[in-house]
Regions:
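Terminal alpha-helical anchor/extension segments at protein ends
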Residues: 1-160
Length: 160
């Protein structure tokens, strides 16, 4: 049995494999989102679009134009986190299709965990053994292993 561990926040995701109860997670790959470090003002390209509409005005007001916004403001950081979560989910779906893991443990910063949970495909969600709401992206593999739920570790063989 092989467990894939994804350790993520809104800017980075590290993927590890664990195949024994006593072993240390082995690094598999990493995804980064360089846009996650930008400020909201740097992520926004412009104000929301605007359009004109003559039909909304009363018939007696010739030549007048009404201007309307195309929608409410969208928070750029939240949007960027959703885009990155879809990339992480896509990576997990690809790995699951290629039978690279049997079980999945998701360790993510609490706000990002919720975003990631929403975008995980059902085919991947079926393999989720546990979720840990902690940002461990910059921690060494030994620390990642220390945060593994004991019941998930007990599913692994003692040695490989």
């Amino acid at each position: 049995m092989r467990i894939r561990i994804v350790v993520a926040n809104q800017a980075e995701a590290a993927f590890y494999d664990l195949d024994s109860r006593t072993g240390e997670p082995k690094f598999a790959t990493r995804l980064t989102d360089p846009l996650a470090h930008l400020h909201d003002r740097d992520l926004k390209s412009d104000r929301p679009g605007r359009f004109s509409d003559h039909a909304l005005l009363s018939p007696g007001r010739r030549g007048a134009t009404a201007h309307h916004g195309t929608g409410g403001e969208r928070r750029p950081r939240k949007h960027e986190a959703e885009v990155f979560a879809r990339q992480v989910a896509g990576q997990l779906e690809h790995a699951q299709r290629n039978a690279e893991f049997d079980r999945l443990v998701v360790m993510a910063a609490p706000p990002f965990l919720g975003v990631l949970r929403k975008v995980l495909p059902d085919s991947v969600r079926l393999h989720v053994a546990a979720e840990v709401g902690k940002d461990l992206v910059n921690q060494p593999p030994a620390s990642v292993r220390a945060h593994m739920p004991p019941d998930v570790l007990s599913e692994l063989p003692a040695v490989v």
